[in-house]
């Protein structure tokens, strides 16, 4: 006889992974379970609210395990958009995706623009013919903050605002709940999910098994002079600011709201304790504005573009580049999901669905979680004698 599914699930982290886990727990066919979610500041207040929201079917195909996760998640995004009215609720839409080489210096172009280049992009912005990277069948987008909040709201989860101090573990090695700063006692749980992005490693139960590092990424959001002229074309740019300088790889995502999101300028850096204190670095923000102006006169501040946001966030990274999804070795009922790097919004749904199956059914069916198990790091530490 199989064990009964847990009745009390506490999710730590109100980003896309935590929200999707809450949704799939609550909508589980056989054992629907509405969880409690603990979030330090507000749902989607960190990377899940400041990411680009780009979705790709097959861009992870070079890594088989990640390919299966990404393809399952891309399909789930379409299903969720149908179920939750994603087009209106959080800007879900298929997009065209292009690779564009920006010239280092302004160039007057007498030749007609390349037919692949959308009309809102200046003809002089492309130093070579653009390449098609994705079609509306293989690439799409969401507004990540709105998506995260919509999925969380649909789950019906109780949201507790507070900082998770530690995971409480019973004498028999089974999870007992979480301790929240400033809250008396333990928030009882039969199962705990740690989905705290780059902050996951601050908890001892995680840091004893593996490390999570941060990658600081900058972004700006602009409202162009004529937003109605901006078409759903996502641009992956290559740009060398000066001869001999490092090649930059910024990205441009127009949104259905008429806003345009531009990101790039990343560096390895661990996040501060409080997500609410994160700010962008002036030089990185200035470079993104420079790049935006090279792409389109519609995106130049001096020509009427409105600055909606200048911001930064931290992406969670692991030593081997793969996410960590599964039960933490030695702590029965304590699960972790982090390390998705720049693919967190894409892979959030399949991660949440797989965790819900693992917690309620005892095994994930939507995708094989073995390659993502935190136990893989125990083997490596053992080989190193750690």
From Swiss-Prot:
Kindly summarize what the UniProt induction comment says about this protein's expression.
Expressed when grown in presence of D-alanine.
Q: Write down the top EC class of this protein.
A: oxidoreductase
Q: Which UniProt keywords apply?
A: FAD, Flavoprotein, Oxidoreductase
Renumbered residue ranges of the record's region Disordered:
109-138
Q: Where does D-serine bind?
A: 253, 261, 332, 362
Q: Which reaction does it catalyse?
A: a D-alpha-amino acid + O2 + H2O = a 2-oxocarboxylate + H2O2 + NH4(+); D-alanine + O2 + H2O = pyruvate + H2O2 + NH4(+); D-aspartate + O2 + H2O = oxaloacetate + H2O2 + NH4(+)
- Can the keyword Ubl conjugation be found in this entry's annotation? no
Any single biological process term in GO: nitrogen utilization
Domain of life according to the entry: Eukaryota
Biased composition, class Pro residues, residue ranges: 112-121
Q: Which InterPro entries match?
A: FAD-dep_OxRdtase, FAD/NAD-bd_sf
Q: Where on this chain does D-proline bind?
A: 261, 332, 362
- Which parts of the chain span the membrane according to its record? none
The residues that the entry says bind D-dopa are 332, 362
Amino-acid biosynthesis found in the keyword field: no
Name the SUPFAM superfamilies for this protein: FAD/NAD(P)-binding domain
Q: Give the EC number.
A: 1.4.3.3, 1.4.3.1
Gene Ontology CC entries for this record: cytoplasm
Return the PANTHER family for the record: OXIDOREDUCTASE TDA3-RELATED, SARCOSINE DEHYDROGENASE-RELATED
> Which family does the record assign?
Belongs to the DAMOX/DASOX family.
Protein name listed in UniProt: D-amino-acid oxidase
The species is Zea mays
